[in-house]
């Protein structure tokens, strides 16, 4: 729970409804920054004004420029905060997680569904994973033990367990993770299995013959089925790499990613740009907080195409060897760009940074830095 003056962290037992206070911060913290950027509500600005004696109804929301600070944020998207651990860089370190903080950074992923947001976030942490599924095979001698004792690889252990045939109830019993989240993760696993019904024959993406014989013996709906599967996968946060691996692309996987990208672009399966407006589109907003999603039909912003924009790529999640000093380089680049009269555009997904503050640039994309992502943007 957080407000503009303090932030508290609780450990909660859903069965007994018992709880313990883990931490209290009498100040704005990293979690406050995340809450502010996730909702588009300027917590620090409002807190400062309240301290000076203003009322919420007196303050204009400086992000939306439409509503007052008294207007409660309404969200039509999902935000996932995922920590980054660098435990592998320390010899002999205990990788079991508890109430003590071991992460060195974090990312903020945004999508229209939980599935989309969590898969984006798992790529954003930059530790070699492509999402919840289609990663390198994890060697886990005892899945039950790995589920009971959380480590930095726990979510990938859950993926391994689902692939091995564990049910949602079994994983819930071992992890105590709420079934709602496990069901969403199972949805991703199910979509991965459905993608395995596709294959490439003579350079064309099609259904496997045994699937075609049962689902569409006449072959009339084959193209529609393939396109629906791809669209569903993209709406659940699957990258082109994941899709290529799931359909069994043979050869270099970078070429596989490009093949999938070329196919879906020809099929019109493209992302759209949406605003983080705190209003769920209830009122017009002028916010420059933006994200990409495949669950939409139109962009919320219009591009001038005047070639007057310069894009700055952020440094992503903090890690051992890369921290605030690299982000400050990005901030100085943005300041110089604006001073020279150009439109400044930042692509970053680290909620801790100054570069992801709403007033640092003309447009801020809270999105993944990858070939299939930035190339869709024309500032």
For each predicted feature, which ranges?
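Conserved small/polar residues in nucleotide/adenosyl-binding loops
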Residues: 1-8, 200, 207, 225, ...
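ATP-dependent carboxylate activation and anion-phosphoryl transfer catalytic cores
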Residues: 2-194, 229, 233-237, 255, ...
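Short, basic, low-complexity termini and linkers enriched in Ser/Thr/Gly/Pro
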Residues: 197-213, 219-230, 370
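Extended, domain-scale alpha-helical bundle/helix-rich regions
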Residues: 236, 242-246
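Glycine/threonine-rich flexible loop motifs
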Residues: 319-329
């Amino acid at each position: 729970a957080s407000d503009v003056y303090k932030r508290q962290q609780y450990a909660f037992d859903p069965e007994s409804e018992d709880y313990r206070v883990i931490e209290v911060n009498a100040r704005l913290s990293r979690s406050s920054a995340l809450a502010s950027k996730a909702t588009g509500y300027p917590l620090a600005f409002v807190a400062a004004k309240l301290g000076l004696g203003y009322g919420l109804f007196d303050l204009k929301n400086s992000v939306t420029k439409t509503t007052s600070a008294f207007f409660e944020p309404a969200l039509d998207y999902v935000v996932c905060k995922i920590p980054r651990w660098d435990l592998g860089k320390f010899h002999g370190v205990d990788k079991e997680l508890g109430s003590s903080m071991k992460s060195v950074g974090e990312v903020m992923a945004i999508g229209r569904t939980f599935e989309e947001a969590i898969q984006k976030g798992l790529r954003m942490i930059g530790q070699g994973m492509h999402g919840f599924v289609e990663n390198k095979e994890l060697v886990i001698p005892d899945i039950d033990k790995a589920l009971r004792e959380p480590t930095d690889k726990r979510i990938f252990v859950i993926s391994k367990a689902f692939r091995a045939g564990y049910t949602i109830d079994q994983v819930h019993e071992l992890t105590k993770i709420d079934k709602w989240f496990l069901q969403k993760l199972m949805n991703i696993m199910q979509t991965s299995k459905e993608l395995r019904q596709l294959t490439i024959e003579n350079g064309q993406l099609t259904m496997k013959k045994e699937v075609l014989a049962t689902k569409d013996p006449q072959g009339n709906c084959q193209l529609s089925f393939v396109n629906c599967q791809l669209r569903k996968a993209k709406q659940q946060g699957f990258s082109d790499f994941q899709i290529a691996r799931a359909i069994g692309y043979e050869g270099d996987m970078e070429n596989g990613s490009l093949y999938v990208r070329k196919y879906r672009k020809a099929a019109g399966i493209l992302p759209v740009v949406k605003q983080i407006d705190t209003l769920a589109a209830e009122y017009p907003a002028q916010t420059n907080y933006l994200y990409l999603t495949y669950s939409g039909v139109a962009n919320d912003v219009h591009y001038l195409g005047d070639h007057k924009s310069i894009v700055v790529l952020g440094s992503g999640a903090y890690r051992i060897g890369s921290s605030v000093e690299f982000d400050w380089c990005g901030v100085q680049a943005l300041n110089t760009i604006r001073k020279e009269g150009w439109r400044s555009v930042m692509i970053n997904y680290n909620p801790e940074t100054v570069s992801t503050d709403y007033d640092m640039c003309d447009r801020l994309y809270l999105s993944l830095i990858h070939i299939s992502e930035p190339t869709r943007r024309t500032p």
